[in-house]
Amino acid sequence: VSVSKLKVGLKCGGSDGLSGITANPLVGSFSDKLISMGGTTVLTEVPEMFGAETILMNRCRTEKLFNKTVDLINNFKEYFLKYGEKTDENPSPGNKAGGITTIADKSLGCVQKGGSAVVEDVLSYAEPVKKKGLSLLQAPGNDLVASNALAASGCQLVLFTTGRGTPFGCPVPTAKLSSNT
């Protein structure tokens, strides 16, 4: 089977101050390489993108995709506000203990997993992947919910970066890349 058939979900959890500058860029390089060979990667964890979303917006292939990305981010922020959640309470206590100080730190690490590829599609939660290349998927940062969304969208593998470690697994093979140096 050709590598061009591969659909890989990109996820992180238990991030620390170094995983965003070590493991996440490594996954981004993998994503770029897979896409150059005709494969597909899917980036999720929308709240983790807050603060770095313009990096992804500027990589959208079309104005329509740009607008869908804006809506993806804004709809999540509106959801948080509707239910009294603060959009700036990220990073988590574990992230902070590991050295991430702001949502900007965490967001810049999150978007690194998408490499430098053009955004080809924006998907609703669990919507099947339709296009080759990099897609953005609506899902929260929660490991269980986001990874299951990736699996439901058709990803056959999830690359999961972590600095602090996690026992998490999901319905599709989950390769953990742990880095804290």
Feature locations, PLM:
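Active-site cavity-forming subdomains of large catalytic enzyme subunits
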Residues: 1
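Anaerobic metallocofactor- and corrinoid-dependent redox/one-carbon enzyme cores
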Residues: 5, 10-12, 16-181
